Amino acid sequence: LTASSHASFDRAYPDESSPGEAGSGGFAHYELDARFYDETFRGDGSLRGVSRRLGTALSKAVPEELAQLQEGVARRFIHEGITFTVIGADKASEQIIPIDCVPRLLTAGEWDHIDRGLRQRLTALNLFLGDIYGDGKSLRDGIVPPDLVLGCPQYRVEMRGLQVPNDIYVAVCGTDVVRTHDGFAVLEDNLRVPSGVSYMLACRAAMKQALPRLYRAHNVREIARYPEQLYATLASLGSWAGAPRVAVLTPGRYNSAYYEHAFLAGEMGAELVEGRDLVVHDGIVYARTVTGLRRIDVIYRRVDDDFLDPVTFRSDSLLGVPGLFHAYRAGNVVIANAPGTGVADDKAVYAYVPDLIRYFLDEEPILANVDTHLCRTREGLAYTLDNLEDLVVKEVGGSGGYGMLVGPHSTAGERKRFAARLRSHPENFISQPVLDLSRATCFVEGNLEPRHVDVRPFVLRGRSDTWIAPGGLCRVALRRGGLVVNSSQGGGCKDLWVLRDGGAPD
């Protein structure tokens, strides 16, 4: 939709004398399921307080208007080339990420709870990383099994004893948060190269244009400052005489998140570089430019540890910079996030994060973990094998929804093959219950219907403060009955409106 063709239901004050109900009006095809927390409706079918204005407006919309709205926001994504890459059996294909035109809403109080929990969690994880690459007291005290940490593929012995600037190992974090009837919980920590923030910003831009009146009327907190805040965070990690030169290190245009790398570099005014664009002389990192070499002070890397430096890590890497880690150890360049942070987002280490919060902060976790069974233990393996049909089983180092088994949606043959993998290498897997993920309103297949969602907020930790964008990448399982929200597995995204006030969580 253009600015001159807004839908008739985009009104700041829709008539609330007849608010929408599940199963009627525009929600005629909306079916509630008591197993799942519904973000829009209460159990009796009435609108939640936070959804009353938007839900009332949607209830009065005709399908043609909603289809036009959906087409407009999708066309914007196509026009701007907002893509991701899906890895298939034979090849990789670039696709436009699907966007849903109905925003998800959270109250100020709900967001405050998430915000406080994420700050607490990232503080503890940074302290944990400093400890395991330092004196290792948490390992000696048995908070986390030493063999789990030291044997993790993401643990980098090269980082031992290295003084990380301001003790900030993780400056950029994307934490996946889910909601059930029991409240909010953390599903996964993404500490290495978290992605998706460009989709968050793109969703917001599309929805502000498509529903400007409803957007203004909801008094939504803004997220547009993220690139500016990211630059400030990166710049704060070192001591500079003037403004530091920041570069975004990308694997290149064939990477699944290349759109995001280019977007963030452009928004920050940073250099977008590949490994071949950088060179190290006398322990200093320079970018090759048409006017000669230019020193780089901070590297926001979107390249995995293994490929950062062929001298220190994988010798066959063509993506990294020879000598980069030497320059980093010498303190001549900042790398964010620091190498070796992946050990703290390993899915087996995840199970111990509540204990790490208690150990390092002497606080109870604000955000709960999901119950997790470690197949590396005899009890965890036995439980997982006995209940395979009812569990989600994940590789401890996996991501993107690849390499996992969703028990209720699997065949007997798939479970048999997965059980063989578990018995062969139990240390590579964890299992969790199938979560009753909350459902939010989406426009799919020509109707307003509920779909399962999660959200990935983005947390920035600088020298003196922590900043969290008041929103996040809200991911949607667009397939009816599906629980996997990853874009690589058929998921999409939608805007998340965090309200400044109003709306009881009920």
Task: Annotate each PLM feature.
Residues 1-506:
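Preference for protein termini
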